[in-house]
Protein backbone atom coordinates (compact mmCIF):
# COMPACT_ATOMS: atom_id res chain seq x y z
CA UNK A 1 0.00 0.00 0.00
CA UNK A 2 2.85 2.37 0.85
CA UNK A 3 4.55 1.51 -2.43
CA UNK A 4 1.37 2.41 -4.34
CA UNK A 5 1.13 5.77 -2.55
CA UNK A 6 4.75 6.56 -3.40
CA UNK A 7 4.15 5.74 -7.08
CA UNK A 8 1.05 7.97 -7.17
CA UNK A 9 2.96 10.83 -5.52
CA UNK A 10 5.82 10.59 -8.02
CA UNK A 11 3.34 10.50 -10.92
CA UNK A 12 1.50 13.58 -9.65
CA UNK A 13 4.78 15.45 -9.21
CA UNK A 14 5.79 14.59 -12.78
CA UNK A 15 2.45 15.75 -14.19
CA UNK A 16 2.54 18.91 -12.09
CA UNK A 17 6.07 19.84 -13.16
CA UNK A 18 5.26 19.06 -16.80
CA UNK A 19 2.26 21.39 -16.74
CA UNK A 20 4.46 24.29 -15.72
CA UNK A 21 7.57 23.60 -17.80
CA UNK A 22 7.51 24.84 -21.39
CA UNK A 23 9.28 22.89 -24.13
CA UNK A 24 10.05 24.68 -27.39
CA UNK A 25 11.97 23.58 -30.46
CA UNK A 26 12.15 25.81 -33.55
CA UNK A 27 14.56 25.43 -36.44
CA UNK A 28 14.70 28.42 -38.82
CA UNK A 29 11.07 29.19 -38.03
CA UNK A 30 9.59 32.59 -38.99
CA UNK A 31 10.03 35.11 -36.21
CA UNK A 32 6.33 35.92 -36.31
CA UNK A 33 5.54 32.26 -35.49
CA UNK A 34 7.74 32.58 -32.41
CA UNK A 35 5.82 35.73 -31.42
CA UNK A 36 2.52 33.90 -31.92
CA UNK A 37 3.73 31.07 -29.66
CA UNK A 38 4.69 33.52 -26.92
CA UNK A 39 1.36 35.36 -27.13
CA UNK A 40 -0.58 32.10 -26.79
CA UNK A 41 1.52 30.91 -23.86
CA UNK A 42 1.28 34.14 -21.87
CA UNK A 43 -2.01 35.60 -23.08
CA UNK A 44 -0.27 38.93 -23.75
CA UNK A 45 -1.22 41.16 -26.69
CA UNK A 46 1.77 41.89 -28.91
CA UNK A 47 2.11 44.39 -31.78
CA UNK A 48 4.76 43.54 -34.37
CA UNK A 49 6.48 46.40 -36.21
CA UNK A 50 6.40 46.08 -40.05
CA UNK A 51 10.21 45.89 -40.21
CA UNK A 52 10.35 42.80 -37.97
CA UNK A 53 11.28 39.96 -40.30
CA UNK A 54 13.54 36.91 -40.19
CA UNK A 55 13.83 33.43 -38.68
CA UNK A 56 14.84 32.04 -35.29
CA UNK A 57 16.31 28.78 -34.06
CA UNK A 58 15.44 27.88 -30.46
CA UNK A 59 15.96 24.67 -28.46
CA UNK A 60 14.83 24.68 -24.84
CA UNK A 61 13.55 21.78 -22.77
CA UNK A 62 12.59 23.61 -19.57
CA UNK A 63 11.34 27.21 -19.49
CA UNK A 64 9.34 28.07 -16.40
CA UNK A 65 6.26 30.32 -16.84
CA UNK A 66 7.77 33.08 -14.70
CA UNK A 67 10.81 33.13 -17.01
CA UNK A 68 8.93 33.12 -20.32
CA UNK A 69 9.07 36.89 -20.81
CA UNK A 70 12.80 37.15 -20.12
CA UNK A 71 13.45 34.07 -22.26
CA UNK A 72 11.41 35.58 -25.09
CA UNK A 73 13.24 38.93 -24.89
CA UNK A 74 16.62 37.17 -24.86
CA UNK A 75 15.79 35.35 -28.09
CA UNK A 76 14.57 38.59 -29.68
CA UNK A 77 17.75 40.45 -28.73
CA UNK A 78 19.88 37.64 -30.08
CA UNK A 79 18.22 38.40 -33.43
CA UNK A 80 18.55 42.22 -33.10
CA UNK A 81 14.94 42.78 -32.03
CA UNK A 82 13.37 43.69 -28.71
CA UNK A 83 10.01 44.02 -26.95
CA UNK A 84 9.17 47.30 -25.23
CA UNK A 85 6.14 48.73 -23.49
CA UNK A 86 3.21 46.80 -22.09
CA UNK A 87 -0.54 46.29 -22.66
CA UNK A 88 0.16 45.66 -25.48
CA UNK A 89 3.89 45.24 -25.98
CA UNK A 90 5.64 46.35 -29.18
CA UNK A 91 8.29 44.30 -30.98
CA UNK A 92 10.73 46.43 -32.96
CA UNK A 93 14.37 46.76 -33.97
CA UNK A 94 16.70 46.47 -30.98
CA UNK A 95 18.14 49.82 -29.87
CA UNK A 96 20.82 49.29 -27.19
CA UNK A 97 21.11 53.07 -26.65
CA UNK A 98 17.54 53.43 -25.47
CA UNK A 99 16.92 54.27 -21.83
CA UNK A 100 14.77 51.16 -21.52
CA UNK A 101 17.84 48.93 -21.76
CA UNK A 102 20.95 48.34 -19.70
CA UNK A 103 24.07 46.46 -20.68
CA UNK A 104 24.45 42.77 -19.93
CA UNK A 105 25.35 42.33 -16.28
CA UNK A 106 28.48 40.43 -15.21
CA UNK A 107 27.94 37.07 -13.57
CA UNK A 108 29.00 38.42 -10.18
CA UNK A 109 26.16 40.93 -10.26
CA UNK A 110 23.59 38.47 -11.55
CA UNK A 111 24.10 36.32 -8.46
CA UNK A 112 22.62 39.11 -6.36
CA UNK A 113 19.25 38.65 -8.07
CA UNK A 114 16.83 35.77 -7.86
CA UNK A 115 17.87 33.11 -10.36
CA UNK A 116 14.26 32.89 -11.58
CA UNK A 117 14.20 36.55 -12.65
CA UNK A 118 16.24 35.97 -15.81
CA UNK A 119 17.86 33.11 -17.70
CA UNK A 120 21.58 32.54 -17.28
CA UNK A 121 23.59 34.88 -19.50
CA UNK A 122 20.48 36.94 -20.31
CA UNK A 123 19.46 40.56 -19.67
CA UNK A 124 17.86 42.27 -16.76
CA UNK A 125 14.82 44.17 -18.10
CA UNK A 126 13.57 46.92 -15.79
CA UNK A 127 9.88 47.73 -15.85
CA UNK A 128 8.94 51.20 -17.11
CA UNK A 129 5.79 53.24 -16.68
CA UNK A 130 4.99 53.50 -20.40
CA UNK A 131 1.46 52.78 -21.56
CA UNK A 132 0.59 51.69 -25.09
CA UNK A 133 -2.51 53.16 -26.69
CA UNK A 134 -4.01 53.31 -30.19
CA UNK A 135 -5.41 56.43 -31.87
CA UNK A 136 -7.73 56.46 -34.89
CA UNK A 137 -6.69 58.91 -37.61
CA UNK A 138 -9.61 60.13 -39.71
CA UNK A 139 -8.42 62.60 -42.36
CA UNK A 140 -4.79 61.84 -43.27
CA UNK A 141 -2.58 58.76 -43.50
CA UNK A 142 -1.40 57.63 -40.09
CA UNK A 143 2.16 57.06 -41.30
CA UNK A 144 2.37 60.72 -42.36
CA UNK A 145 1.88 61.78 -38.73
CA UNK A 146 4.57 59.55 -37.18
CA UNK A 147 7.32 62.19 -37.19
CA UNK A 148 4.95 64.90 -35.95
CA UNK A 149 3.72 62.76 -33.05
CA UNK A 150 7.29 61.70 -32.21
CA UNK A 151 8.27 65.37 -32.00
CA UNK A 152 5.31 66.10 -29.70
CA UNK A 153 6.10 63.19 -27.37
CA UNK A 154 9.86 63.78 -27.19
CA UNK A 155 9.40 67.51 -26.56
CA UNK A 156 7.25 66.74 -23.51
CA UNK A 157 9.22 63.91 -21.90
CA UNK A 158 12.78 62.67 -21.69
CA UNK A 159 11.65 59.07 -21.30
CA UNK A 160 11.76 56.64 -24.18
CA UNK A 161 8.74 56.37 -26.45
CA UNK A 162 7.66 54.62 -29.62
CA UNK A 163 5.24 55.56 -32.39
CA UNK A 164 4.10 53.09 -35.06
CA UNK A 165 1.37 53.11 -37.69
CA UNK A 166 -1.04 50.34 -38.66
CA UNK A 167 -1.66 51.08 -42.32
CA UNK A 168 -4.57 48.70 -42.82
CA UNK A 169 -6.78 50.39 -40.22
CA UNK A 170 -5.04 53.81 -40.31
CA UNK A 171 -4.13 53.72 -36.63
CA UNK A 172 -1.29 55.23 -34.64
CA UNK A 173 0.13 53.04 -31.88
CA UNK A 174 1.93 55.14 -29.27
CA UNK A 175 3.90 53.86 -26.29
CA UNK A 176 4.65 56.70 -23.87
CA UNK A 177 3.98 57.86 -20.29
CA UNK A 178 0.28 58.09 -19.47
CA UNK A 179 0.24 61.86 -18.95
CA UNK A 180 1.59 62.34 -22.49
CA UNK A 181 -1.06 60.04 -23.95
CA UNK A 182 -3.78 61.97 -22.12
CA UNK A 183 -2.77 65.18 -23.94
CA UNK A 184 -2.15 63.56 -27.32
CA UNK A 185 -5.80 63.58 -28.58
CA UNK A 186 -5.93 67.37 -28.27
CA UNK A 187 -2.71 67.68 -30.27
CA UNK A 188 -3.93 65.23 -32.92
CA UNK A 189 -7.05 67.34 -33.46
CA UNK A 190 -4.79 70.16 -34.72
CA UNK A 191 -2.95 68.05 -37.31
CA UNK A 192 -5.56 65.45 -38.32
CA UNK A 193 -7.36 67.84 -40.67
CA UNK A 194 -9.03 67.30 -44.08
CA UNK A 195 -6.64 67.95 -46.97
CA UNK A 196 -7.68 69.86 -50.07
CA UNK A 197 -7.09 68.39 -53.51
CA UNK A 198 -5.79 70.39 -56.47
CA UNK A 199 -6.77 69.81 -60.09
CA UNK A 200 -3.94 70.64 -62.50
CA UNK A 201 -4.97 71.07 -66.14
CA UNK A 202 -2.22 71.54 -68.69
CA UNK A 203 -1.78 72.26 -72.38
CA UNK A 204 1.60 71.69 -74.02
CA UNK A 205 1.82 72.92 -77.61
CA UNK A 206 4.21 74.09 -80.34
CA UNK A 207 3.89 77.07 -82.66
CA UNK A 208 5.96 77.48 -85.82
CA UNK A 209 8.12 80.56 -85.66
CA UNK A 210 6.82 83.54 -87.63
CA UNK A 211 3.24 82.29 -87.80
CA UNK A 212 0.58 84.47 -86.22
CA UNK A 213 -1.54 82.33 -83.95
CA UNK A 214 -4.96 83.92 -83.54
CA UNK A 215 -6.20 83.59 -80.00
CA UNK A 216 -8.59 86.49 -80.32
CA UNK A 217 -11.79 84.46 -80.03
CA UNK A 218 -10.17 82.10 -77.53
CA UNK A 219 -8.89 84.69 -75.09
CA UNK A 220 -11.54 87.23 -76.01
CA UNK A 221 -12.02 89.64 -73.19
CA UNK A 222 -10.25 87.42 -70.69
CA UNK A 223 -7.92 89.86 -69.07
CA UNK A 224 -4.68 88.74 -67.57
CA UNK A 225 -1.42 90.01 -66.14
CA UNK A 226 1.91 89.26 -67.74
CA UNK A 227 4.62 88.52 -65.22
CA UNK A 228 6.17 91.87 -64.43
CA UNK A 229 2.89 93.73 -64.03
CA UNK A 230 2.01 94.50 -67.68
CA UNK A 231 -1.72 94.19 -68.34
CA UNK A 232 -2.93 92.50 -71.52
CA UNK A 233 -6.34 92.01 -73.08
CA UNK A 234 -5.54 89.02 -75.27
CA UNK A 235 -3.40 85.94 -75.02
CA UNK A 236 -2.35 86.62 -78.63
CA UNK A 237 -0.41 89.71 -77.64
CA UNK A 238 1.61 87.71 -75.14
CA UNK A 239 2.56 85.02 -77.64
CA UNK A 240 3.39 87.45 -80.44
CA UNK A 241 5.23 90.06 -78.37
CA UNK A 242 8.99 90.11 -78.50
CA UNK A 243 10.23 87.79 -75.80
CA UNK A 244 6.73 87.25 -74.46
CA UNK A 245 6.75 83.77 -73.00
CA UNK A 246 4.87 83.86 -69.71
CA UNK A 247 1.82 85.42 -68.12
CA UNK A 248 -1.06 84.83 -65.71
CA UNK A 249 -4.69 84.91 -66.87
CA UNK A 250 -8.15 84.66 -65.36
CA UNK A 251 -11.12 82.88 -66.91
CA UNK A 252 -11.39 79.80 -69.12
CA UNK A 253 -8.28 80.55 -71.18
CA UNK A 254 -7.19 76.92 -71.24
CA UNK A 255 -10.34 75.43 -72.72
CA UNK A 256 -10.74 78.13 -75.34
CA UNK A 257 -7.06 77.91 -76.31
CA UNK A 258 -7.45 74.22 -77.17
CA UNK A 259 -10.12 75.12 -79.71
CA UNK A 260 -7.95 77.84 -81.25
CA UNK A 261 -4.96 75.51 -81.60
CA UNK A 262 -7.02 72.80 -83.29
CA UNK A 263 -8.12 75.22 -86.01
CA UNK A 264 -4.59 76.48 -86.75
CA UNK A 265 -2.53 74.42 -89.18
CA UNK A 266 0.76 75.91 -87.95
CA UNK A 267 0.34 74.80 -84.35
CA UNK A 268 0.58 71.35 -82.82
CA UNK A 269 -0.87 70.14 -79.52
CA UNK A 270 1.66 67.83 -77.87
CA UNK A 271 -0.24 66.90 -74.72
CA UNK A 272 -3.29 67.86 -72.65
CA UNK A 273 -2.48 66.42 -69.20
CA UNK A 274 -4.93 66.35 -66.28
CA UNK A 275 -3.63 65.63 -62.78
CA UNK A 276 -5.61 65.54 -59.52
CA UNK A 277 -3.44 65.32 -56.43
CA UNK A 278 -3.59 66.09 -52.72
CA UNK A 279 -2.13 69.34 -51.47
CA UNK A 280 1.47 68.66 -50.51
CA UNK A 281 1.74 65.52 -52.67
CA UNK A 282 3.52 65.10 -55.99
CA UNK A 283 1.59 64.17 -59.12
CA UNK A 284 3.00 63.28 -62.54
CA UNK A 285 1.89 62.09 -65.95
CA UNK A 286 3.92 61.05 -68.99
CA UNK A 287 3.55 59.53 -72.43
CA UNK A 288 6.28 58.48 -74.83
CA UNK A 289 8.74 55.71 -75.59
CA UNK A 290 11.17 53.67 -73.55
CA UNK A 291 14.32 54.00 -75.67
CA UNK A 292 17.47 51.86 -75.27
CA UNK A 293 20.81 53.69 -75.02
CA UNK A 294 24.12 51.85 -75.37
CA UNK A 295 26.22 52.49 -72.26
CA UNK A 296 29.09 50.07 -72.95
CA UNK A 297 30.44 47.62 -75.49
CA UNK A 298 33.01 44.81 -75.20
CA UNK A 299 34.65 43.36 -78.33
CA UNK A 300 38.04 42.15 -79.49
CA UNK A 301 40.59 40.35 -77.33
CA UNK A 302 38.85 41.09 -74.03
CA UNK A 303 35.74 39.18 -75.09
CA UNK A 304 34.66 36.26 -77.17
CA UNK A 305 34.99 37.51 -80.74
CA UNK A 306 32.18 35.24 -81.85
CA UNK A 307 29.91 36.57 -79.11
CA UNK A 308 30.61 40.26 -78.33
CA UNK A 309 28.21 41.98 -75.96
CA UNK A 310 27.08 45.46 -75.01
CA UNK A 311 25.27 47.00 -72.05
CA UNK A 312 22.07 48.95 -72.61
CA UNK A 313 20.18 51.40 -70.40
CA UNK A 314 16.58 52.32 -71.17
CA UNK A 315 15.24 55.84 -70.65
CA UNK A 316 11.85 57.42 -71.18
CA UNK A 317 11.61 59.85 -74.08
CA UNK A 318 8.38 61.77 -74.60
CA UNK A 319 6.05 64.31 -73.02
CA UNK A 320 5.85 64.52 -69.22
CA UNK A 321 4.63 66.87 -66.52
CA UNK A 322 5.08 66.67 -62.77
CA UNK A 323 3.60 69.04 -60.20
CA UNK A 324 3.87 69.57 -56.46
CA UNK A 325 1.05 71.88 -55.35
CA UNK A 326 0.35 73.30 -51.90
CA UNK A 327 -2.98 74.99 -51.17
CA UNK A 328 -2.62 78.01 -48.89
CA UNK A 329 -5.24 79.23 -46.43
CA UNK A 330 -5.88 82.44 -48.36
CA UNK A 331 -6.85 80.68 -51.59
CA UNK A 332 -3.42 80.84 -53.19
CA UNK A 333 -1.61 77.83 -54.66
CA UNK A 334 2.17 77.46 -54.51
CA UNK A 335 3.02 75.23 -57.46
CA UNK A 336 6.26 73.46 -58.38
CA UNK A 337 6.07 72.61 -62.09
CA UNK A 338 8.40 70.51 -64.23
CA UNK A 339 7.44 69.97 -67.86
CA UNK A 340 9.50 68.10 -70.46
CA UNK A 341 9.07 67.57 -74.18
CA UNK A 342 11.76 65.18 -75.45
CA UNK A 343 11.97 63.67 -78.92
CA UNK A 344 14.27 61.48 -80.98
CA UNK A 345 16.54 63.28 -83.41
CA UNK A 346 16.73 62.21 -87.05
CA UNK A 347 20.42 63.10 -87.18
CA UNK A 348 22.78 60.29 -88.24
CA UNK A 349 26.02 62.00 -87.21
CA UNK A 350 26.33 59.97 -84.00
CA UNK A 351 26.66 56.21 -83.65
CA UNK A 352 23.85 56.04 -81.09
CA UNK A 353 20.45 57.61 -80.53
CA UNK A 354 20.28 61.41 -80.21
CA UNK A 355 17.46 63.05 -78.26
CA UNK A 356 16.15 66.60 -78.40
CA UNK A 357 15.31 67.91 -74.95
CA UNK A 358 13.20 70.88 -73.90
CA UNK A 359 12.17 71.33 -70.29
CA UNK A 360 10.72 73.93 -67.94
CA UNK A 361 11.06 73.85 -64.14
CA UNK A 362 9.76 76.65 -61.93
CA UNK A 363 7.87 77.54 -58.75
CA UNK A 364 4.96 79.98 -58.98
CA UNK A 365 2.17 81.42 -56.83
CA UNK A 366 -1.30 81.39 -58.41
CA UNK A 367 -4.77 82.29 -57.28
CA UNK A 368 -7.39 79.55 -57.34
CA UNK A 369 -8.55 79.07 -60.95
CA UNK A 370 -5.85 81.15 -62.64
CA UNK A 371 -3.99 79.99 -65.76
CA UNK A 372 -0.23 80.33 -66.15
CA UNK A 373 1.58 80.58 -69.49
CA UNK A 374 5.20 79.40 -69.67
CA UNK A 375 7.33 78.94 -72.75
CA UNK A 376 9.70 80.46 -75.22
CA UNK A 377 11.70 77.27 -75.77
CA UNK A 378 12.69 77.40 -79.45
CA UNK A 379 13.79 74.34 -81.41
CA UNK A 380 15.71 74.52 -84.70
CA UNK A 381 15.61 71.68 -87.20
CA UNK A 382 17.76 71.60 -90.33
CA UNK A 383 16.92 68.82 -92.76
CA UNK A 384 18.39 67.88 -96.13
CA UNK A 385 16.71 65.61 -98.65
CA UNK A 386 18.24 64.10 -101.79
CA UNK A 387 16.04 62.97 -104.68
CA UNK A 388 16.62 61.86 -108.26
CA UNK A 389 15.62 59.66 -111.16
CA UNK A 390 16.36 56.00 -110.39
CA UNK A 391 19.49 54.59 -112.11
CA UNK A 392 20.12 57.81 -114.10
CA UNK A 393 21.02 59.82 -110.99
CA UNK A 394 23.77 57.27 -110.21
CA UNK A 395 25.64 57.77 -113.53
CA UNK A 396 28.95 59.58 -112.95
CA UNK A 397 29.07 63.22 -114.05
CA UNK A 398 25.76 63.35 -115.92
CA UNK A 399 23.91 61.90 -112.92
CA UNK A 400 23.83 65.38 -111.37
CA UNK A 401 21.43 66.42 -114.13
CA UNK A 402 18.89 63.87 -112.87
CA UNK A 403 19.19 64.54 -109.09
CA UNK A 404 18.46 67.37 -106.70
CA UNK A 405 18.93 68.31 -103.03
CA UNK A 406 16.56 70.36 -100.93
CA UNK A 407 17.40 71.97 -97.58
CA UNK A 408 14.78 73.17 -95.13
CA UNK A 409 14.95 74.97 -91.82
CA UNK A 410 12.17 74.62 -89.27
CA UNK A 411 11.84 76.67 -86.13
CA UNK A 412 9.19 76.02 -83.49
CA UNK A 413 8.52 77.38 -80.02
CA UNK A 414 7.20 75.37 -77.09
CA UNK A 415 4.56 76.80 -74.74
CA UNK A 416 2.91 75.39 -71.63
CA UNK A 417 -0.45 76.52 -70.22
CA UNK A 418 -1.22 75.39 -66.67
CA UNK A 419 -4.45 75.96 -64.75
CA UNK A 420 -4.70 75.16 -61.02
CA UNK A 421 -8.04 74.73 -59.24
CA UNK A 422 -8.57 73.87 -55.57
CA UNK A 423 -11.05 71.05 -54.91
CA UNK A 424 -12.16 71.66 -51.35
CA UNK A 425 -12.30 68.74 -48.93
CA UNK A 426 -15.81 67.65 -47.98
Curated annotation (Swiss-Prot):
Keywords: Host membrane, Membrane, Signal, Transmembrane, Transmembrane helix, Viral extrusion, Viral release from host cell. InterPro entries: Bact_Secretion_Sys_Channel, GspD-like_N0, GspD/PilQ, NolW-like, NolW-like_sf, T2SS/T3SS_dom, T2SS_GspD_CS. The chain crosses the membrane at residues 317-337. Pfam families: Secretin (PF00263), Secretin_N (PF03958), type_II_gspD_N0 (PF21305). It is a single-pass type I membrane protein. Residues 1-21 form the signal peptide. It is found in: Host membrane. One of its GO terms (cellular component) is membrane. The keyword Heme does not apply. GO terms for biological process: protein secretion; viral extrusion. Belongs to the inovirus G4P protein family. Acts in the assembly and extrusion of the bacteriophage by forming a channel across the host outer membrane. This channel is just large enough to allow a newly synthesized phage particle to pass through. Extrusion is a process of concomitant assembly and secretion and takes place at specific assembly sites where host inner and outer membranes are in close contacts. Homomultimer. The channel is composed of 14 G4P subunits that confer a barrel-like structure. Interacts with G1P; this interaction results in a complex that spans the inner an outer host membranes. This is Virion export protein. It comes from Enterobacteria phage fd (Bacteriophage fd).
Amino acid sequence: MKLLNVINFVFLMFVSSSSFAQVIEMNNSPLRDFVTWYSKQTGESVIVSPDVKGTVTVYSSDVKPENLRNFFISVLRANNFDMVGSIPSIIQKYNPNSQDYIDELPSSDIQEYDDNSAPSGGFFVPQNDNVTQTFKINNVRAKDLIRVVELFVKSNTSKSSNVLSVDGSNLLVVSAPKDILDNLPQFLSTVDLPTDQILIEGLIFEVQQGDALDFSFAAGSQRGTVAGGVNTDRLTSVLSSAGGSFGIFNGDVLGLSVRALKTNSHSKILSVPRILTLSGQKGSISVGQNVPFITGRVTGESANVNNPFQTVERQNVGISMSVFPVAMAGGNIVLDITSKADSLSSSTQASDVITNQRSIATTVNLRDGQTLLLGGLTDYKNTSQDSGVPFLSKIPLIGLLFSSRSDSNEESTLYVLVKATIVRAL
